[in-house]
Amino acid sequence: MKKKGKNRIIIGCKTQLKDINTLFASIFTLTSLDFSHFDTSQVFNMKSLFFDMSTITDLDLSNFKTDNVTDMSLMFKDCSSLINLNLSNFNTNKVIYMKSMFDGCCSLINLNIDNFNTENVISMRSMFSFCSSLKNLNILHFKTNKVNDMRYMFYECSNIENLDLSNFNTENVKNMKCMFSKCLKLINLNIKNFCFNNINNYKDLSVILDISKNQKDSNIGNMFENINENCQIIFGN
């Protein structure tokens, strides 16, 4: 690990690490890291890698090789000052856990994850919770066939205006509690292909909307409470 400047560190490693769980967690003095010499080709665990790095503003991870990674849960959780995040070369083909991956990234305005393959992911719980500066999020390409937990997935994404989840397969999802709660500016939500057959807990699936006129079933009556009253939700036929 080499120092460069007051708040910038160049990361280098002569050995091939396999588990870098919490490697940089809770470091409060850095604003950026240089990973151009960091070999991640053998890594399988990146859980909580940057957890609670509350002063980091820029992360360019375009050099990361993630072909073998299975766990990315809490990877950027509570990186509350993070503004620029480059994940353009991430290979997520083997990733199983994305729980709270971006949870608490409240300064992140743009998030490009168009390259993410989520076909093996089983948990997306709180994946984007408290991403309160995000205005747009393109995840239409997400494959969610294996996902069983989506609770709090977009909780308090308070600036997001449009969410197109029309390609989501939710047949195996068991919990959607508070999935859209406190999405205060959400205008359009497309969930036309959502399946609720295995849901154990509907309460507060919330998009901050009273749909009592359209939904009388007491089991899902609180599904969309407390969001933008003008939000248009597209359901299936």
Task: Locate each region found by the language model.
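Negatively charged
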Residues: 1-237
